[in-house]
Amino acid sequence: LDVRDIADGVIYDEDGLRVTALHTSHMGHDAQYGWRAFGFSVEADGKKLVYTGDTGGYDDYAPLLENCDLLLHETGHHDPLAAARHLAESGRAPKRLGFIHHGRTILADPEGVQARLNTVDGISARILNDGETVEL
């Protein structure tokens, strides 16, 4: 096990697998430890997945969205409908959007939230369940 601090940029690039880190504003910057929350892109076999991590919002992960096949977006701190609409209107929408790390909005009414997500034009958004597999 090789544990190390990370910073923005490519943190792994071997055997056709590339992982890029980008700090988020979720926990801010600490003078001793630097950025304490990160989002990541994972690229392999011509596919790209972006994981927001705990995020302060769109501006935190937007630089990772180019050619994104699947964006895994946390909803513990964000409204999924607002996030889907913003992404659809941004001109940088991923091919697919999967919501994870669910907050109260989704936990209270997952079917209702999914029904509302289905009405957002310009993006394919789904609420994902723990343990669910998504093929790219």
Feature-to-residue mapping (PLM):
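Active-site neighborhood of divalent metal-dependent phosphoester bond hydrolases
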Residues: 1-2, 107
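Core dinuclear metal-dependent hydrolase active-site scaffold
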Residues: 2-63, 130-136
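Cap/insert and terminal regions of metallo-dependent hydrolase folds
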Residues: 56-136
